[in-house]
Amino acid sequence: MAVSKKLFVELVTPERELWAGEGDMVIAKTVEGEIGIQPGHVPVLALLAPGSVVRVLGARESGEVRAAVHGGFMSVTLSDRVSILAEIAELAEEIDVERARAALKSAEREALGDAEMRARVARARGRLRAAKAEEAA
Protein backbone atom coordinates (compact mmCIF):
# COMPACT_ATOMS: atom_id res chain seq x y z
CA MET A 1 0.00 0.00 0.00
CA ALA A 2 1.36 3.40 -0.96
CA VAL A 3 1.71 5.84 1.91
CA SER A 4 -0.21 9.09 1.44
CA LYS A 5 1.46 12.35 2.29
CA LYS A 6 -1.27 13.67 4.62
CA LEU A 7 -3.77 12.39 7.15
CA PHE A 8 -7.42 13.38 6.97
CA VAL A 9 -8.38 14.34 10.51
CA GLU A 10 -11.80 15.07 11.96
CA LEU A 11 -12.55 16.22 15.49
CA VAL A 12 -16.20 15.84 16.46
CA THR A 13 -18.43 15.91 19.53
CA PRO A 14 -22.07 14.84 19.80
CA GLU A 15 -23.04 18.49 19.21
CA ARG A 16 -20.85 19.46 16.24
CA GLU A 17 -17.82 18.99 14.08
CA LEU A 18 -15.09 21.16 15.60
CA TRP A 19 -12.53 20.78 12.85
CA ALA A 20 -11.79 18.66 9.80
CA GLY A 21 -8.84 18.89 7.46
CA GLU A 22 -5.44 17.54 6.55
CA GLY A 23 -2.41 17.23 8.77
CA ASP A 24 1.01 15.60 8.89
CA MET A 25 0.71 14.09 12.37
CA VAL A 26 -1.78 13.70 15.22
CA ILE A 27 -0.57 13.56 18.81
CA ALA A 28 -3.06 12.46 21.47
CA LYS A 29 -2.98 11.22 25.04
CA THR A 30 -4.80 7.95 25.55
CA VAL A 31 -5.43 6.04 28.76
CA GLU A 32 -2.41 3.90 27.77
CA GLY A 33 -0.08 6.85 27.13
CA GLU A 34 0.72 9.38 24.42
CA ILE A 35 0.52 8.28 20.79
CA GLY A 36 1.68 9.89 17.56
CA ILE A 37 -0.04 9.04 14.28
CA GLN A 38 1.53 9.67 10.87
CA PRO A 39 0.43 8.55 7.39
CA GLY A 40 0.76 4.79 6.98
CA HIS A 41 0.08 4.05 10.66
CA VAL A 42 -1.57 0.74 11.49
CA PRO A 43 -5.28 0.90 12.39
CA VAL A 44 -5.90 1.87 16.01
CA LEU A 45 -8.90 2.35 18.26
CA ALA A 46 -7.89 4.12 21.47
CA LEU A 47 -9.66 5.53 24.51
CA LEU A 48 -8.71 9.20 25.02
CA ALA A 49 -7.54 10.32 28.45
CA PRO A 50 -9.76 12.82 30.28
CA GLY A 51 -8.46 16.38 30.26
CA SER A 52 -5.97 15.85 27.46
CA VAL A 53 -4.85 17.95 24.50
CA VAL A 54 -5.03 16.66 20.93
CA ARG A 55 -2.60 18.25 18.46
CA VAL A 56 -2.75 18.08 14.67
CA LEU A 57 0.63 19.12 13.26
CA GLY A 58 1.02 20.42 9.72
CA ALA A 59 -2.51 21.81 9.60
CA ARG A 60 -3.72 25.34 8.75
CA GLU A 61 -1.44 28.25 7.99
CA SER A 62 -0.33 28.30 11.63
CA GLY A 63 0.89 24.74 11.28
CA GLU A 64 -1.07 23.31 14.20
CA VAL A 65 -4.58 22.68 15.49
CA ARG A 66 -4.98 22.13 19.25
CA ALA A 67 -8.04 21.04 21.16
CA ALA A 68 -8.85 20.28 24.78
CA VAL A 69 -10.55 16.88 24.87
CA HIS A 70 -12.38 15.24 27.74
CA GLY A 71 -13.11 11.60 27.09
CA GLY A 72 -13.94 9.81 23.88
CA PHE A 73 -12.15 7.73 21.28
CA MET A 74 -9.60 8.03 18.50
CA SER A 75 -9.92 5.83 15.44
CA VAL A 76 -7.19 5.41 12.81
CA THR A 77 -7.95 3.58 9.55
CA LEU A 78 -5.81 2.10 6.79
CA SER A 79 -6.90 4.97 4.54
CA ASP A 80 -5.04 7.48 6.77
CA ARG A 81 -8.24 8.81 8.30
CA VAL A 82 -8.08 9.85 11.97
CA SER A 83 -11.36 10.44 13.77
CA ILE A 84 -11.35 12.01 17.21
CA LEU A 85 -14.78 11.33 18.70
CA ALA A 86 -14.88 13.30 21.94
CA GLU A 87 -17.53 13.58 24.61
CA ILE A 88 -16.48 17.20 25.24
CA ALA A 89 -13.93 19.18 23.21
CA GLU A 90 -12.94 22.78 22.49
CA LEU A 91 -10.51 24.23 19.99
CA ALA A 92 -7.75 26.19 21.72
CA GLU A 93 -8.80 29.48 20.14
CA GLU A 94 -12.35 29.05 21.51
CA ILE A 95 -11.21 28.78 25.14
CA ASP A 96 -11.64 31.80 27.41
CA VAL A 97 -8.45 31.53 29.49
CA GLU A 98 -9.73 33.58 32.45
CA ARG A 99 -12.92 31.53 32.61
CA ALA A 100 -10.88 28.32 32.39
CA ARG A 101 -8.65 29.48 35.26
CA ALA A 102 -11.71 30.27 37.37
CA ALA A 103 -13.20 26.84 36.58
CA LEU A 104 -9.94 25.16 37.60
CA LYS A 105 -9.79 27.03 40.92
CA SER A 106 -13.42 26.19 41.64
CA ALA A 107 -12.95 22.51 40.78
CA GLU A 108 -9.76 22.26 42.86
CA ARG A 109 -11.53 23.72 45.91
CA GLU A 110 -14.30 21.13 45.62
CA ALA A 111 -12.17 18.12 44.62
CA LEU A 112 -11.71 16.30 47.88
CA GLY A 113 -11.72 12.75 46.51
CA ASP A 114 -14.95 12.87 44.51
CA ALA A 115 -14.44 11.27 41.09
CA GLU A 116 -16.69 13.78 39.32
CA MET A 117 -14.77 16.69 40.82
CA ARG A 118 -11.44 15.14 39.81
CA ALA A 119 -12.82 14.90 36.27
CA ARG A 120 -13.73 18.60 36.40
CA VAL A 121 -10.18 19.43 37.49
CA ALA A 122 -8.72 17.32 34.67
CA ARG A 123 -11.01 18.97 32.11
CA ALA A 124 -10.14 22.48 33.34
CA ARG A 125 -6.40 21.74 33.26
CA GLY A 126 -6.69 20.33 29.73
CA ARG A 127 -8.51 23.45 28.56
CA LEU A 128 -5.77 25.65 29.98
CA ARG A 129 -3.00 23.54 28.43
CA ALA A 130 -4.65 23.81 25.01
CA ALA A 131 -5.35 27.54 25.35
CA LYS A 132 -1.90 28.44 26.65
CA ALA A 133 -0.26 26.66 23.75
CA GLU A 134 -2.49 28.66 21.39
CA GLU A 135 -1.49 31.95 23.07
CA ALA A 136 2.21 31.12 22.64
CA ALA A 137 1.78 30.39 18.91
UniProtKB/Swiss-Prot annotation:
How does the record describe its quaternary structure?
Answer: F-type ATPases have 2 components, CF(1) - the catalytic core - and CF(0) - the membrane proton channel. CF(1) has five subunits: alpha(3), beta(3), gamma(1), delta(1), epsilon(1). CF(0) has three main subunits: a, b and c.
Question: What does it do?
Answer: Produces ATP from ADP in the presence of a proton gradient across the membrane.
Lineage at the top is: Bacteria, Bacillati, Actinomycetota, Actinomycetes, Streptosporangiales
Ion transport found in the keyword field: yes
Bilayer topology term: Peripheral membrane protein
Taken from the UniProt entry, a GO cellular component term is: plasma membrane
Name of the protein in its database record: ATP synthase epsilon chain
Sorted keywords for this record are: ATP synthesis, Cell membrane, CF(1), Hydrogen ion transport, Ion transport, Membrane, Transport
**Where does the record say this protein resides?**
Cell membrane
- Hey, which family's this protein in? Belongs to the ATPase epsilon chain family.
Annotated GO molecular function terms are:
ATP binding; proton-transporting ATP synthase activity, rotational mechanism
- Asked if the keyword Transport belongs to this entry, the reply reads yes
Annotated PANTHER family: ATP SYNTHASE DELTA/EPSILON CHAIN (PTHR13822), ATP SYNTHASE EPSILON CHAIN, CHLOROPLASTIC (PTHR13822:SF10)
Q: Which organism is it from?
A: Thermobifida fusca (strain YX)
